[in-house]
Amino acid sequence: MIDRQRMGLWALAILTLPMYLTVTEGSKSSWGLENEALIVRCPQRGRSTYPVEWYYSDTNESIPTQKRNRIFVSRDRLKFLPARVEDSGIYACVIRSPNLNKTGYLNVTIHKKPPSCNIPDYLMYSTVRGSDKNFKITCPTIDLYNWTAPVQWFKNCKALQEPRFRAHRSYLFIDNVTHDDEGDYTCQFTHAENGTNYIVTATRSFTVEEKGFSMFPVITNPPYNHTMEVEIGKPASIACSACFGKGSHFLADVLWQINKTVVGNFGEARIQEEEGRNESSSNDMDCLTSVLRITGVTEKDLSLEYDCLALNLHGMIRHTIRLRRKQPIDHRSIYYIVAGCSLLLMFINVLVIVLKVFWIEVALFWRDIVTPYKTRNDGKLYDAYIIYPRVFRGSAAGTHSVEYFVHHTLPDVLENKCGYKLCIYGRDLLPGQDAATVVESSIQNSRRQVFVLAPHMMHSKEFAYEQEIALHSALIQNNSKVILIEMEPLGEASRLQVGDLQDSLQHLVKIQGTIKWREDHVADKQSLSSKFWKHVRYQMPVPERASKTASVAAPLSGKACLDLKHF
């Protein structure tokens, strides 16, 4: 009797247990941004139509349903209008049915808005990947809200304005998708509740995936009918690489054969084949590589054929290579090449040094060889106009040496020996002409302006006028070049003071320097091989090599310079 009563009690308990059983399962995480609307759904909702109750998990306090509260329950949804950072926590939802209670937990985290455009990963929804030419992105969680169009879209925090971006309902359509369209896309919409509008934003990444394709195998290595050099007794490695398209490939493989026999059946332990490994080529093609390794090359290996095979569902391709003995390096030839290059480099360095030291001599020699009879059609009458300080009453003794240098030394060398035409003030006289006009015309018709600089030159008014005209022609009009000859006296006290010269003349002295004439330094004052005359000839134009008679007579002709005694 007692056993029957116990059995009845157990049966009653088993029958009534489902009425009071509560199933605790299901948990989910959700997040939102501060001062935005956040609506979450009970994880245990499913298709149930039974009422849902929400609780604060830490206090078991029931969350009200009145809409006047900032946090309230609406059917199976929990609304935060707006959400705040202190709302973060775990919330429990209970679905009560006549036979079973289901409890779910929701971990809600409210974050502050990022100060910059860089959105952290924990605020990103699932990444969207697309490969179609035209693609659409869905705004996440928008179906939970009471929103009205339009939805605003942003890419990397910048509003989308191009016509190929089209917003329709909760979607963003992108036409002609390219890799430039990859990035973070944010949708922004408005949730309306009790006459108040709340902003909601959601961000997800978009990446472009190109569609894969399969093609006939293409062997990229080794080349067709290639011959590889190896050393006897040394190890050797040969790679067989082939590309099959993009994406996953079914039944694609690369392998080696030796004399039309697979490596595993060839029977040589020295020769092993590594399994194919996946690689990507420079154009993003999917490729496979298999490496044939020979631990020690023998003479027998040189007579074998090695086939690189690539095959897939499209077909098979084969590249055959052979091995040959590597020729030893001819060290003697290398020594000869290194020695020859070293000698050539030394010769070039010596040549550069010689040219730098003897550049003027080389240039003068080149003139004599290459242009011995050069003619000019520039319309100039003279090769040089000589500008020098005149003799006047009370002049220093050095003035007379300048006069002798200008009227005797210069013509003897430059006119009689070199064939130049000089225009020298005071050498010839054509009366009845205006002095200033004739000086200016003579300077304009000269290819060089030779300044003879002396310590007493500042006392010569004629020198100052000619200097002005000549510098204007050389520096302003770029009509001629200037040669500066400095007369060095024997005493140190009467040297030329450059600071006393005109600014333009000081500039020329600083830039190109002067050619110094000192009588005690020159043994043969008219020798063309002296350093002074080499420098003068180098700066003079290339002379016309007319007959010596013509060269001497030229200064005495009607085109010679004028005697401007009363300048």
Swiss-Prot record:
Can you give the residue ranges of the TIR domain?
Answer: 380-540
Q: What is its EC number?
A: 3.2.2.6
The impact of changing residue 442 to A is: Complete loss of phosphorylation by GSK3B
The active site is formed by: 466
Q: Phosphoserine (modified residue): where?
A: 442
Keyword terms of this UniProt record? Cell membrane, Disulfide bond, Glycoprotein, Hydrolase, Immunoglobulin domain, Isopeptide bond, Membrane, NAD, Phosphoprotein, Receptor, Repeat, Secreted, Signal, Transmembrane, Transmembrane helix, Ubl conjugation
Effect on the protein upon substituting residue 326 to R:
Complete loss of FBXL19-mediated polyubiquitination
**Location in or out of the cell:** Cell membrane
Give the stretches traversing the membrane: 333-355
**Assigned GO CC terms:** cytosol; external side of plasma membrane; extracellular matrix; extracellular region; focal adhesion; membrane
Q: List the effects observed when the gene is inactivated.
A: In response to cardiotoxin-induced muscle injury, mutant mice show impaired inflammation resolution characterized by deficient muscle fiber regeneration and impaired clearance of necrotic cells.
Question: Disulphide bridges in this chain?
Answer: 42-93, 117-157, 139-187, 240-308, 243-287
Q: Which GO terms describe its molecular function?
A: interleukin-1 receptor activity; interleukin-33 binding; interleukin-33 receptor activity; NAD+ nucleosidase activity, cyclic ADP-ribose generating
Annotated Ig-like C2-type domain ranges read 27-109, 120-203, 217-324
User: Which residue spans belong to the Extracellular compartment?
Assistant: 27-332
Free-text function comment from the UniProt entry: Receptor for interleukin-33 (IL-33) which plays crucial roles in innate and adaptive immunity, contributing to tissue homeostasis and responses to environmental stresses together with coreceptor IL1RAP. Its stimulation recruits MYD88, IRAK1, IRAK4, and TRAF6, followed by phosphorylation of MAPK3/ERK1 and/or MAPK1/ERK2, MAPK14, and MAPK8. Possibly involved in helper T-cell function.
How it assembles, according to the record, is: Interacts with MYD88, IRAK1, IRAK4, and TRAF6. Bound to its ligand IL33, interacts with IL1RAP to form the minimal interleukin-33 signaling complex with a 1:1:1 stoichiometry. Interacts with KIT (bound to KITLG/SCF). A mast cell-specific KITLG/SCF-induced interleukin-33 signaling complex contains IL1RL1, IL1RAP, KIT and MYD88. Interacts with TMED1.
> What is the official name of this protein in its record?
Interleukin-1 receptor-like 1
